[in-house]
Each structure stands twice: as C-alpha cells, then as structure tokens.
C-alpha cells in the first residue's frame, strides 16, 4: 500500500507514564537537564567556531584544552568577571531583568522534550522516562513558552536608551511573530498524522516511519522558520552589524550580554530538539539500525541517538551562517508572509484530505499522483511566478543643474518633485545678476566639451 495513504499507527497512551515519580527523581531530572543544556551550549559554541574556521581555511580555537574544547568555558569566565556597564539613559531595572526574561523560557521548554524511553536509574530499582513531564498539548506549551522570550529582547532594546537597540528589538518581535505563524502551520500536519499534541505520543507514533520522510513540505517549512525564530544567519536581521551595530544587545556587556548569548544558543538547541521530536522520530534509532540491532532503542542508547540528531540540526545552523549572506529586511518579511504561510496553508489542506481519505479506506495511486502534481504546480506558482508581481523599487531622479550650479529646493508652488528643470533661465533676473559669471575662457572650454 502507498506510504502516504496507508493508515499509520496512532500514538499510544504514553502520558500514563508521567505523574508517578518521587520528588527526588523529578529534582534529579531537572538538574540533569540544566547541566546537559549548559554543556551543550559550551560545545555548540566551540563546534560553531571550529566548523566556520574550517570553512574559512583556518583552524579555529585549538589552544585551551584538547582541540580547544575549553575555549568556550574560558570565554564564559571572562564575561562573568568583566565589569557591567549600564548606560546613563537606560532604565536600570528593566535593563537588568530583560536578559533573565530572555533566558528562562529557553530552559523551561526542555521540560516536555523526551530524551529517551523509560530506564532504570543507576544504583536504584526506580524506573522513569527520560523526560521531565508531558501533557496533552505539550507542543503548544513549547511554542507558548518560546514566544515569551521575545519580551526579554524587546524590553532589552527599549530599556537600553539606544536607537540601534530599540530597532533591533522591534525587528526581532516582528520577525518572531511572522515566522511563528509559519512554524505553527508546519506542525499541524504532524498533529493530523499523530493524532496527538503530546511529545511522547508523537515520538511513539514514529516507531516505524519518521514524519520527516512523508511530510517533507512541513519539514522544510519548519527548518526555514526555526532559523528565523532564533535570529540566526542568514536571518540575523535584529543584530545586523552593518545596520544596527549589535542590535538589541549593543549596550549590554559582562554577564547580561552572556545571558542573551546563552538564550540564543539554548533556543538553537530547543528548536533542534523539537524538530528531532516531531520529524526525525525523537530518540528512536535510525530505522535501518533498528532492524539490524534489536537493542538499539533500549537502555541509554536512545539518548545518544537523540543528541546526534540535535547536533545534526545545529550543524545546519552553522552551515547556513558560513555560506549564505544576510537577507534584506523587506525580502525576509515578504518571504515569510507571501511564500511560507500560503504554502503551509495549501499543504495542510492537502494533508487533511489525504489523511481523511486514507483512513476511510484508501485511494487509488493514480489520483494521488495527480493531486500531488497539481499541488507541486501550485508551489511553483507561489514561489517563482508570484515574485514578478512584487512592487518594483522607485528611483528618485537626481537634481538637474542650472547654469553650472545645483538647483536649490524649490519653494511651495514650484515644480513637482522629479519634474525636469530647464537648463536655461533668465540671466536678467535679480538672482542671476547676483551670481558670479564664468570667465570667457571657462565659457569657451565648456562649449568645446
């Protein structure tokens, strides 16, 4: 039977595993998540600098520790002990609390991310899932908490007392609102196939087939939207150095700057973990390895598969930063509203139709192929032909010279802006008589030219 039309196994009742842990087990898992995120952030910073260094034919950090692994830790210690400078025009209370607002939601989102199946805690007989908690609307919880972090960026830009910071904060808010819509629409197809919004149930539903293989448009839309959500290159417009110096953290230094930096890299890990959970089977081993090795999804091995998939998405972030130039702000916003969102809406309708027909008894493959072909044509029209109707930028004509001198701004009632100004004028006027007259040699030279 066709993969797209075959009834997929619905998610199991994985929520029954939660709500039974002892208090010390919950505390232990919370501390471990915090430690893993901090270590993963230090590793990702080192990994990015090494990969970008190789792309630019240089070694990258290679002095502190083996392979330079301790360079990120050294940089963190340096920022901790640096002096914190608060601008005179800043709102001190909001200025200091903004980085905290930005970083806390990035930690909270990992509370519903499944790192692995149920395991036995070493040196005890207690069994617990490698996930802090879960809920029936866990994915919506992740998106809601992640959107709170934008308040820290906007408040940080506003409270700094700098125009550059304020513009960076406003850009970031507009960017996140625009691409969060596309991201949410990309996830609707996953909900339709899994029959649940619980992260653990979505992972369980991908036991035999990953959604990234059958929901390719949703996967691609999510990949683009997650780069825009995290303000990473080529969508790092809120902190464009050539336009806004440093964007919303221009006036930040020391530990407050480190918190913004930490929030950015943890958000990278968050969207990568969500992509792993919803599209690449979560902690499940690659399907070819699962068939060859029966114990691939047992014990603590799933934690390794999960982290490997997360690092794969982190590498995509780094690769995009090292290869693509930054987009213009108008191009970026138009791409989100005029391309991603319409395509996501069309794809949701197609997925809902295919899913409904498949659950009612299947559909002939020929009709399915015809429908997919028509859908592909719509995608092509939206992506390529739609750009021709965009408004062309207008150019302002240069001011025409008069008698060798620039034309000053015309008073009210003068020619309309852009209208041609005659090159000759009445030299007997009072204005012309007060102007210096060119010599005979200058006039003859001008005539020869």
UniProtKB/Swiss-Prot annotation:
<feature type="transmembrane region" description="Helical">
    <location>
        <begin position="258"/>
        <end position="280"/>
    </location>
</feature>
<feature type="transmembrane region" description="Helical">
    <location>
        <begin position="176"/>
        <end position="196"/>
    </location>
</feature>
<dbReference type="GO" id="GO:0005886">
    <property type="term" value="C:plasma membrane"/>
</dbReference>
<feature type="transmembrane region" description="Helical">
    <location>
        <begin position="368"/>
        <end position="388"/>
    </location>
</feature>
<comment type="subunit">
    <text>NDH-1 is composed of 14 different subunits. Subunits NuoA, H, J, K, L, M, N constitute the membrane sector of the complex.</text>
</comment>
<keyword id="KW-0830">Ubiquinone</keyword>
<keyword id="KW-0874">Quinone</keyword>
<protein>
    <recommendedName>
        <fullName>NADH-quinone oxidoreductase subunit H</fullName>
        <ecNumber>7.1.1.-</ecNumber>
    </recommendedName>
</protein>
<dbReference type="InterPro" id="IPR001694">
    <property type="entry name" value="NADH_UbQ_OxRdtase_su1/FPO"/>
</dbReference>
<keyword id="KW-1278">Translocase</keyword>
<dbReference type="GO" id="GO:0009060">
    <property type="term" value="P:aerobic respiration"/>
</dbReference>
<feature type="transmembrane region" description="Helical">
    <location>
        <begin position="23"/>
        <end position="43"/>
    </location>
</feature>
<feature type="transmembrane region" description="Helical">
    <location>
        <begin position="137"/>
        <end position="157"/>
    </location>
</feature>
<feature type="compositionally biased region" description="Polar residues">
    <location>
        <begin position="427"/>
        <end position="442"/>
    </location>
</feature>
<dbReference type="GO" id="GO:0003954">
    <property type="term" value="F:NADH dehydrogenase activity"/>
</dbReference>
<keyword id="KW-0812">Transmembrane</keyword>
<dbReference type="GO" id="GO:0048038">
    <property type="term" value="F:quinone binding"/>
</dbReference>
<keyword id="KW-0472">Membrane</keyword>
<dbReference type="Pfam" id="PF00146">
    <property type="entry name" value="NADHdh"/>
</dbReference>
<comment type="function">
    <text>NDH-1 shuttles electrons from NADH, via FMN and iron-sulfur (Fe-S) centers, to quinones in the respiratory chain. The immediate electron acceptor for the enzyme in this species is believed to be ubiquinone. Couples the redox reaction to proton translocation (for every two electrons transferred, four hydrogen ions are translocated across the cytoplasmic membrane), and thus conserves the redox energy in a proton gradient. This subunit may bind ubiquinone.</text>
</comment>
<feature type="transmembrane region" description="Helical">
    <location>
        <begin position="300"/>
        <end position="320"/>
    </location>
</feature>
<feature type="transmembrane region" description="Helical">
    <location>
        <begin position="332"/>
        <end position="352"/>
    </location>
</feature>
<keyword id="KW-0520">NAD</keyword>
<keyword id="KW-1133">Transmembrane helix</keyword>
<keyword id="KW-1003">Cell membrane</keyword>
<feature type="transmembrane region" description="Helical">
    <location>
        <begin position="93"/>
        <end position="113"/>
    </location>
</feature>
<feature type="region of interest" description="Disordered">
    <location>
        <begin position="427"/>
        <end position="449"/>
    </location>
</feature>
<dbReference type="GO" id="GO:0016655">
    <property type="term" value="F:oxidoreductase activity, acting on NAD(P)H, quinone or similar compound as acceptor"/>
</dbReference>
<dbReference type="InterPro" id="IPR018086">
    <property type="entry name" value="NADH_UbQ_OxRdtase_su1_CS"/>
</dbReference>
<comment type="similarity">
    <text>Belongs to the complex I subunit 1 family.</text>
</comment>
<feature type="transmembrane region" description="Helical">
    <location>
        <begin position="209"/>
        <end position="229"/>
    </location>
</feature>
